[in-house]
């Protein structure tokens, strides 16, 4: 049994705080085995010794956990393990002789123990280089996992150990640099050295991939998990080269507010530029995507152009058509769009873009070649499109998407003239309208951000929603698929990129989360692997009461490695449930399956527009609420720490909030189970108070309610909103 000393962890956390800021994620450790207890009955005895011998003899029925029985940590059950086991039982030795204060008992690279290694960075490396940053991360996490203290040495001739983890900074303009690109890496194990090669981000990504092999799971903003294992080996002769398929990978939500950069965002290999505080951090290769404004920029640029411009980004008054607009009209989401065919409107937008770039430069920020972009995109509405004669005429053949993409094309041509010092700066334009334009095609330096707002109920390529009523875009998923394939083809023919904006979360009722976890793999696989998009934006978050952080984790894993199989994906899902919810994770997986089935497959719905009564099968919940609740309660009984208990109790609130809404008429109003209803209801309200949970978007602006009224549409997920 491992005996990790608290003081060592405190020291490790302090070191990280000094190196990377004031925050470090808490280490959550697996307690997966006890040395010698091969039958896992809680004691080490003669039966365990017998099981080891029986396993070696190939006897049927032998029970022998390899981690528990591999005393010498050679990766197998052997005669030496049997010998050591006998010695422990006789008192000549002790199982503590084969234990460690750390989660990884033995780490080998090229056949050599990790304690025989140092870390080598280029002689001229500084802390601003990605190779140096990666070396620091490797040093820190290997210390946590094994206790080894790896010295960072500058230049190979200055190495302090015979073997080394050697980081190499590769120039982007050399042959290997062109092969690896901005994010790829290559590594090999040769003559007992681990050699790592990368350009701007590759050294960092390789480090995190190797640390995952060691046993780390970077699953949370606030916690890092490590599995307990006897032996990890990176073998002599091993080599690998990897380049991420997607150029833009972003999972947006409330998961990066603590130490999210160092402990979650970068280890998850996300690179989206919406993490503003890290956009210019050269240690991590800066970030990819639009600077300053995520997507909807026309309202802001109009304000910058027509208001009183100063050296900072204070709010400016905005005038449109001679009228001063209200604040709600000139923010990032005004209820209007500029004219797409007016030279005057175009010049205002370009002036606003120019002034915004100037503002960014005056802050001391820089644009990174090939990966930096600026948004040049419609405001966040779908009703304010210009209806002048010229726009209406162009709309007939190009749709609203082609109408405004052509406006962005014009800006993309002019931006090269306006900023010749930024020859690779791209402009990003979001499209809501999925019309397939007849003639308009994007310029090479335009990024199309395709908002996939079809049906959130059915897998996007299932064909299951074709006959149902259309949603806000008058489109079902099959129409979205047709448009996405066409736009992807157009973009790639033009040498432009297309990114997909995916909406998996409903923000309307936080306690009745969208029951779509088990269909995400199908959507990811189709959108990325079959349609061939170049970037993926997964908008999640809100309140993490149900499975929202699980969705974020699954998305992060898949968009970095879209070649994973469904079996690999499912294993990642189950591992996460174990890490997040604890020993009762199998109960939660069964609950998750029932939660998926409880989502009705008979209708189409759209997150943030439809309400839970259209997303759930009320009849199924009425029949299965008690069983679903029992599963969560069973998992709660096995919780071993406060984080697991909080996660499970919040999940119970979601189960009760949705379930009690469904059975309200039968149990309470009709009197068939009033006592059970009141008991569950009271417990739910207590937990809502305990964790200060907010039931819905519409309610609890100023505090947590003491009671919920399921007959009030603002609190109930079942009553239809007029």
List each model region and its residues:
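Structured mid-domain segments that build the active-site/substrate or prosthetic-cofactor binding neighborhood
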Residues: 337-347, 358, 362, 469-586, ...
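Substrate-binding cleft/loops of secretory-pathway carbohydrate-active enzymes
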Residues: 428-457, 511-517, 545-552
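Catalytic domains of carbohydrate-active enzymes that cleave complex glycans
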Residues: 556-722
């Amino acid at each position: 049994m491992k005996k990790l000393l608290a003081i060592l962890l405190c020291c490790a956390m302090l070191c990280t705080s000094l190196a990377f800021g004031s925050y470090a994620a808490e280490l959550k450790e697996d307690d997966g085995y006890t040395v010698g207890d091969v039958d896992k009955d809680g004691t080490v005895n003669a039966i365990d010794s017998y099981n080891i011998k029986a396993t070696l003899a190939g006897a049927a029925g032998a029970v022998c956990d390899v981690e528990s029985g591999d005393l010498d940590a050679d990766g197998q059950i052997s005669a030496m393990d049997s010998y050591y086991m006998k010695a422990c039982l006789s008192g000549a030795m002790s199982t503590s002789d084969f234990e460690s204060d750390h989660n990884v008992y033995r780490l080998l690279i090229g056949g050599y123990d990790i304690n025989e290694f140092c870390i080598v960075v280029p002689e001229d490396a500084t802390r601003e280089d990605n190779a140096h940053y990666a070396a620091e991360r490797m040093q820190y996490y290997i210390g946590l996992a094994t206790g080894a203290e790896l010295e960072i040495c500058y230049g190979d001739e200055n190495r302090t150990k015979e073997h080394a983890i050697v980081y190499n900074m590769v120039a982007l303009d050399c042959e290997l640099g062109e092969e690896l690109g901005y994010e790829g890496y290559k590594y090999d194990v040769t003559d007992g050295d681990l050699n790592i090669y990368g350009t701007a981000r590759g050294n960092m990504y390789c480090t995190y991939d190797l640390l995952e092999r060691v046993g780390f799971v970077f699953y949370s903003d606030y916690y890092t998990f490590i599995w307990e294992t006897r032996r990890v080996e990176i073998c002599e002769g091993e080599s690998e080269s990897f380049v991420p398929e997607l150029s833009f990978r972003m999972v947006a939500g409330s998961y990066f507010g603590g130490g999210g950069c160092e402990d979650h965002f970068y280890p998850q290999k996300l690179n989206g530029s919406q993490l503003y505080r890290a956009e210019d951090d050269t240690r991590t290769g800066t970030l990819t995507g639009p600077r300053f404004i995520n997507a909807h920029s026309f309202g802001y640029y109009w304000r910058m152009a027509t208001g009183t411009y100063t050296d900072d980004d204070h709010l400016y008054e905005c005038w449109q058509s001679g009228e001063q607009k209200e604040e709600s009209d000139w923010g990032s989401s005004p209820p209007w769009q500029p004219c797409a065919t007016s030279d005057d409107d175009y010049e205002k937008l370009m002036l606003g873009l120019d002034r915004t770039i100037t503002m960014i430069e005056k802050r001391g920020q820089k644009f990174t070649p090939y990966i930096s972009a600026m948004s040049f995109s419609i405001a966040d509405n779908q009703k304010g499109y210009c209806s002048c004669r010229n726009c209406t005429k162009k709309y007939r053949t190009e749709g609203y998407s082609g109408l405004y993409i052509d406006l962005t094309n014009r800006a993309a041509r002019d931006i090269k003239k306006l900023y010749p010092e930024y020859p690779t700066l791209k402009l990003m334009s979001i499209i809501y309208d999925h019309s397939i334009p007849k003639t308009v095609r994007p310029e090479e330096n335009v990024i199309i951000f395709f908002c996939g707002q079809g049906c959130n109920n059915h897998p996007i390529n299932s064909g299951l929603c074709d006959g149902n009523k259309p949603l806000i875009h008058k489109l079902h998923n099959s129409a979205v698929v047709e448009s996405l394939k066409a736009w992807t083809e157009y973009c790639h023919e033009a040498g432009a990129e297309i990114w997909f904006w995916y909406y998996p979360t409903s923000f309307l009722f936080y306690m009745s989360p969208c029951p779509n976890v088990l269909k995400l793999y199908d959507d990811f696989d189709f959108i990325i692997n079959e349609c061939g998009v170049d970037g993926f934006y997964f908008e999640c978050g809100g309140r993490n009461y149900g499975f929202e952080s699980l969705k974020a984790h699954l998305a992060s894993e898949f968009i970095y490695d879209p070649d994973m199989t469904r079996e690999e994906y499912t294993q990642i899902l189950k591992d996460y449930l174990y890490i997040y919810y604890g020993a009762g994770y199998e109960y939660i997986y069964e609950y998750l399956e029932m939660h998926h089935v409880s989502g009705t497959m008979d209708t189409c719905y759209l997150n943030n527009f439809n309400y839970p009564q259209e997303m759930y099968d009320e009849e199924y919940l009425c029949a299965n609420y008690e069983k679903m609740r029992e599963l969560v309660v069973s998992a709660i009984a096995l919780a071993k720490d406060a984080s697991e208990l909080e996660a499970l109790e919040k999940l119970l609130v979601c189960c009760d909030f949705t379930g009690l809404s469904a059975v309200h008429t039968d149990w309470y109003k009709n009197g068939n189970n009033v006592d059970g209803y009141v008991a569950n209801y009271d417990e739910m309200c207590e937990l809502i108070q305990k964790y200060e949970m907010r039931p819905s978007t519409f309610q609890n602006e100023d505090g947590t309610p003491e009671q919920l009224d399921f007959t009030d549409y603002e609190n109930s997920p079942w009553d239809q909103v007029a």
